[in-house]
Swiss-Prot record:
InterPro entries: KH_dom, KH_dom-like_a/b, KH_dom_type_2, KH_sf_prok-type, Ribosomal_S3_C_sf, Ribosomal_uS3_bac-typ, Ribosomal_uS3_C, Ribosomal_uS3_CS. It comes from the Bacteria. Part of the 30S ribosomal subunit. Forms a tight complex with proteins S10 and S14. The gene is rpsC. HAMAP family: Ribosomal_uS3_B. PANTHER family: 30S/40S RIBOSOMAL PROTEIN S3 (PTHR11760), SMALL RIBOSOMAL SUBUNIT PROTEIN US3C (PTHR11760:SF19). Pfam families: KH_2, Ribosomal_S3_C. The keyword Chloroplast does not apply. This is Small ribosomal subunit protein uS3. CDD domains: KH-II_30S_S3. Binds the lower part of the 30S subunit head. Binds mRNA in the 70S ribosome, positioning it for translation. Residues 39-107 form the KH type-2 domain. Transmembrane segments: none annotated.
Length: 228
């Protein structure tokens, strides 16, 4: 059977960057790794309704800089910045070093793999038909400018006795092209029938020479002059 590598892991250092950036020797590496895991679990639990896509952690010189990528920055910041300050204090206590929090707004949530997966999962939990949820997400992504998108759901779809896998795709999703900028994410929908897994692949274009490929309208062909 075919073995499928993680679409983001294979592109690290090519078109994707690490979400944790720090250096540690053998004695502290495991401690830093475990601390990052706990920080992400804490933030994802606290910010469930904030549409958080990604959490980047940098550790420069006895400090920590955490960047939260969210489609709803107002929920993270809170009234007059009270919520983000409470988060900073809790994370400083948890990590044992001064923490700085940056918030990056996601302008196009329809093109973010994690947010699309969360949206489909939430619709499945509200008992929306899985085909309708997938088709709606695919159409929104293609309308915004995606070059291709694939969504796959697995589990007891529609309350069926036997679990199965269904998928829907539009455009092209070149998983074997390393320069292809593919955003991949997976999420779980907890329904009354059990857990349904949601996977999303979004192809945004190819990165050539460190620059994102841009869609340019084709120039009209020159008109031929009529012979006199």
């Amino acid at each position: 059977m075919g073995q499928k590598v993680h679409p983001i892991g294979i592109r690290l250092g090519i078109v994707k960057e690490h979400t944790s950036v720090w250096y540690a020797d053998g004695r502290t590496y495991a401690d830093y790794l475990f601390a990052d895991l706990k920080v992400r679990e804490y933030l994802q639990d606290k910010l469930k309704s904030a549409s958080v896509s990604r959490i980047d952690i940098h550790r420069p010189a006895q400090t920590a800089r955490i960047t939260i990528h969210t489609a709803r920055p107002g929920i993270v910041i809170g009234k007059k910045g009270e919520d983000v300050e409470k988060l900073r204090q809790d994370l400083t206590k948890q990590m044992g070093v001064p923490v700085h929090i940056n918030i990056e707004e996601i302008r196009k949530p329809e093109l973010d793999g994690m947010l699309v997966a969360q949206s489909v999962a939430q619709q499945l939990e509200r008992r929306v038909m899985f085909r309708r949820a997938m088709k709606r997400a695919v159409q929104n992504a293609m309308r915004i400018g995606a070059k291709g998108i694939k969504i796959q759901v697995s589990g007891r779809l529609g309350g069926a006795e036997i679990a199965r896998t269904e998928w829907y795709r539009e455009g092209r999703v070149p998983l074997h092209t390393l320069r292809a900028d593919i955003d991949y994410a997976n999420y779980e929908a907890h329904t009354t029938y059990g857990v349904i897994g949601v996977k999303v692949w979004i192809f945004k274009g190819e990165v050539i020479g460190g620059r994102q490929e841009e869609l340019k309208p084709q120039a009209p062909a020159p008109r031929k002059k009529a012979a006199k």
